[in-house]
Amino acid sequence: MTILKRVLLGFLVLAGLFMTGCGPDTIRGKEYPINDEKTVADDADLSIDERVQKIVDAMSDEEKVGQMMMIGIQGTTVTDDTRYMLNQYKAGNIILFDRNMQSQEQVKELTTDLQKENSAKVPLFIAVDEEGGDVVRMKNDLQAPPSQQAVGSSGNPATAKDYAFSVGMQLKGMGINMNFAPVADVSATDSRSYGGNASQVYKFVDAAAYGYEAAHIMYGLKHFPGIGRSAVDSHEASSVITTSKSELFQSDLIPFTKTMASHDTTKFVILVSHLVYTGFDAEHPASLSWPIITDLLRNGLQYKGLIITDDMEMGAVTGQHSFRDLGVMAINAGADIVLICHEYGHEKEVYDGILAALKDGRIPRSRVEDSVKSIVKIKLLHLNEEINN
């Protein structure tokens, strides 16, 4: 038996354990406190769009901006700083890192407390990066999958589906409702990619998507429109991709476009990279680019789901603009949620910048309303599903 098969067998056994322990009397209905006081989701005579409109109409500007942010927090419990960000800055979404995660039991308690502390009428998205290989959380407490490169080299897309299902079940059991995976980049050398052939990468991304959907957890395709060609780590510095638009469509974009065409786009998000793609926009990184986010992804490819930026604290963008401006630029480019992963001060600057721009008209109110409606609708559709299934 190969190492990959042995690891996969362990994953399937673990998934079975999670399935037997996660029935209606355990995580469903407790992780996400949707109830009469929190939402109007039980207004049976209203359509989903009417419910969404009712919730959004009742939101303040501050609450709307909070829904358009996903922030990192410090500590393994709900600290005073975290409580302040949830209640004063109305943060609507959280991303967790190893600094927040010590054990499955502790994470479940943390996510439950975060949802209880959440003052919004809809639950928090609580996300992690659990790709496999080197990019995993709680490596010593969870059965981490191998790298996507290793999975891709197996030649069997069903393997990707099984790993995604197992990871999804583990995360859901801890109250995490979104995983920023699979990586849809095309690269023959990057261990985070399923491979260097775009059609092969799509088959594995497609299979992984079905795995996450079977586990009833949101997932995120990244890093649009593809960072497989870059030799520079965008955590550290900016990078420019000079590949032509037509070549990007014939290769790098295939895993994204085909997955969008074959899956319900309300069940996943697309995370946009910080690279510059001169074929689409020679001036702005993708995360701040109207031609890429709105013209290409939203209008050209007709993507209806949520668009999230990569972390705004990465070196690829921090040297170019202030944090107050970065959030404004991302929202005006068409992003629905701005990701800021580490420093409370930076998170506050991004929030303050977006709120000020909304109030003085630099961000059109319709731009914010459209995003918040999409966020609320997807939360009602899929986080509420965890209770009702």
Annotated model-derived regions:
Residues G10-F18:
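Bacterial N-terminal signal peptides
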Residues M68-V78, Q148-D162, S238-S251, E313-H321:
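Active-site mouth loops of central-metabolism enzymes
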Residues Q115-Q143, Y163-V183, A209-P225:
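Glycine-rich, aromatic-flanked loop segments that form ligand/cofactor-binding clefts
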